[in-house]
Amino acid sequence: MSGKLFIILLLLVTPGEARKSFLRFLNIQNPEMLSFTKPEETVIVRSSYEGKRPHSSYLLVKLEDPTVLQVVNVTKTSLDFTDFTINLKTFPGETNLTMQLWESEGRQTRLIEEITNIRVSVFRQTEDSLFQEPIHVNSSVFLLVLLMILLNKCAFGCKIELQVLQTVWKRPLPILLGAVTQFFLMPFCGFLLSQILGLSKAQAFGFVMTCTCPGGGGGYLFALLLEGDVTLAILMACTSTSLALIMMPVNSYLYSCLLGLAGVFHVPVLKIVSTLLFILTPVSIGIVIKHRMPKKAVCLERVVQPLSLTLMLVGVYLAFRMGLVFLRMANLEVFLLGLLVPVLGFSFGYSFAKVYLLPLPVCKTVAIESGMLNSFLALAIIQLSFPQSKAYEASVAPFTVAMCSSCEMLLLLLVYKAKKRPLLSTENEKAPLV
């Protein structure tokens, strides 16, 4: 029965359709997406089609928007293969093009192959371009910073007590509060405030994506420096990054529809997964060291604070260096929203934790994890989601939030340490002399 069915299906397919289905003659480097930056560009398409007569095939290029692309000419060269060279004039914007391979047989023409919906993005690198002034980092320095980050995360793992970890899992209220704040309240507030302040669609989406990002690596650093619950901070960071696998695509789709930008974005799930693994792996190694080699764990715990401060300063320096270009595009409304986003996260997290009468270290941690967002993950999503001409405008949001949240946390840390010092000196004076 199956053999007869297969023969019937073959009889229903004409030879021309069979050739078109199973044979591909045109070869282009990236048939889904082409990116251009120069006023004049060249695309080479290779054809492996051998016609009945030599030089009988030709390439036809159809443009969806002639204000973005214009075909100057198409030249053909034939050696072992046939190469079609398409010379184009480009203008900033986005469009689609279609390539058709035709064969002429006397007065008749026959379509051999067609490639449709080739996405083309054209942008210009101006003096405000991110790549105009690249940051040159020596490979040895980069490797040193990477090793410091891994060592720092491993040292944080050494500070985790399994008993505390089990307690947190049995009472997951702080994690739930952080998740609700990060993935529901913050994106909505980012969307609402961006509409109130009248930001462009690209900037509004940039703020929404920044607000829906999970807590960044700086959360448990400040939890340590502000005497919060470090174990809870690390657990919240891991949990929120895991939830982001679902919530970031959902929020991306929802708010892009509300902004009228549906169908434009691609959320890099692998980037989120790699971030999660980057947090989990060295932290897990630190937990193992804590219980297998407690003496070495004590040594690692001693370097947590100085190493964390060093990495924080390096991060602030790099953020300012990279963000200066983006900040030239920022206006007063963008700066205002960049200042408000972290404050809202801190306020929501701390208020919810206080309402449920959680201990003070837990309240601090929930507030920090709700306000310290992984803005650079939002930047990566924007760079992959937008055409380059719009990516710079949208990237203003995560850089502004990253720098504002870092400055606000540093200011809070200085105030906290300044208030704590008189209290310590007063306690020392009251202590009885032996």
UniProtKB/Swiss-Prot annotation:
Signal peptide interval: 1-18
The name under which this protein is listed is Sodium/bile acid cotransporter 5
Alphabetically sorted, this entry's keywords are: Glycoprotein, Ion transport, Membrane, Signal, Sodium, Sodium transport, Symport, Transmembrane, Transmembrane helix, Transport
Q: Which residues lie on this side of the membrane: Cytoplasmic?
A: 151-172, 217-232, 290-306, 353-365, 417-434
Q: Which residues lie on this side of the membrane: Extracellular?
A: 19-129, 194-195, 256-268, 328-331, 387-395
Q: Taxonomic lineage per UniProt?
A: Eukaryota, Metazoa, Chordata, Craniata, Vertebrata
Q: How does it sit in the membrane?
A: Multi-pass membrane protein
Q: Where is it mostly found?
A: membrane
Q: Which residues are glycosylated?
A: N73, N96
One annotated GO biological process = bile acid and bile salt transport
Q: Does the keyword Signal apply?
A: yes
Spell out the GO cellular component terms annotated for this protein, sorted alphabetically and separated by semicolons.
Answer: membrane
- Where is the protein situated, by its record's location annotation? Membrane
Residue ranges crossing the lipid bilayer per the database entry: 130-150, 173-193, 196-216, 233-255, 269-289, 307-327, 332-352, 366-386, 396-416
- Which InterPro entries does the record cross-reference, listed alphabetically? BilAc:Na_symport/Acr3, Bilac:Na_transpt, Na+/solute_symporter_sf
